[in-house]
């Protein structure tokens, strides 16, 4: 009966509206959702550890041609070339700080040019993604992205380079809520058994959105910031 009661509680939890927004969207795992949406920073011991979907590397195209119009044409031309070469290189392009949007020739103008750190220079930053999983390790994904960057020729004085460290992304983090809840139920049942007949466990916070953090070179930890409370039976 104890196991059944916990399972029924977990099954009764509906997916929050905010969680439904992330059922299928791809997010960047730079840290946890805490930093993005100001949720509680309490990370429970139980979560779902799984491979990330993509290795993500920010790249920058810089140009310093003196004439502004020519400089911008060169940067834009190289960006368009980068988009055209992505599929053949087995990578995908995207933009966004949190939720990722595919970068294509149809929306390339949505990427703004910004002033670089020198006079008469500008840059554009976007993301290159390589799939993880199967036979594709993190190291292999890094090498794939590096080869892609080398394959895109410069245009005028525009050049493309890596921009900072790589990170990970995961598609639809909130779609893993049932698997996370199952792990919580297993741990809660085990805890209840250890407490003896005089005590029960209560689970609080299961209505919170799924959160995430990086768990290893190519893995993420998905979790719900629940709270397990041991209480005496009446």
Task: Give, region by region, the residue ranges found by the protein language model.
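N-terminal signal peptide c-region/cleavage motif recognized by signal peptidases
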Residues: 14-16
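Short, linear, compositionally biased motifs with a strong N-terminal bias
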Residues: 10-11
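Short, charged, surface-exposed interaction patches
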Residues: 20-187, 193-234
């Amino acid at each position: 009966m104890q196991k059944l009661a916990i399972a029924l509680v977990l099954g009764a939890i509906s997916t929050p509206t905010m969680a439904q927004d992330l059922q299928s969207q791809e997010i960047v795992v730079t840290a946890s959702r805490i930093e993005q949406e100001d949720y509680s920073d309490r990370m429970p011991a139980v979560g779902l550890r799984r491979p990330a979907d993509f290795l993500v590397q920010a790249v920058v195209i810089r140009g310093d041609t003196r004439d502004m119009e020519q400089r911008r044409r060169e940067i834009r031309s190289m960006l368009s070339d980068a988009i055209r070469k992505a599929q053949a290189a087995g990578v995908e392009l995207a933009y966004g700080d949190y939720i990722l949007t595919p970068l294509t020739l149809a929306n390339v103008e949505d990427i703004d040019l910004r002033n670089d750190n020198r006079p008469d220079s500008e840059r554009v930053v976007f993301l290159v993604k390589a799939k993880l999983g199967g036979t594709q390790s993190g190291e292999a994904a890094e090498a794939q992205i590096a080869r892609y960057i080398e394959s895109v020729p410069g245009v005028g004085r525009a050049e493309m380079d890596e921009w900072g460290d790589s990170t990970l992304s995961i598609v639809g983090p909130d779609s893993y809520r049932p698997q996370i809840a199952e792990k919580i139920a297993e741990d809660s049942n085990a805890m209840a058994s250890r407490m003896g007949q005089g005590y029960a466990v209560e689970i609080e916070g299961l209505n919170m959105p799924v959160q995430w953090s990086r768990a290893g070179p190519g893995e993420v930890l998905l979790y719900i910031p629940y709270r397990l409370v041991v209480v005496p039976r009446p």
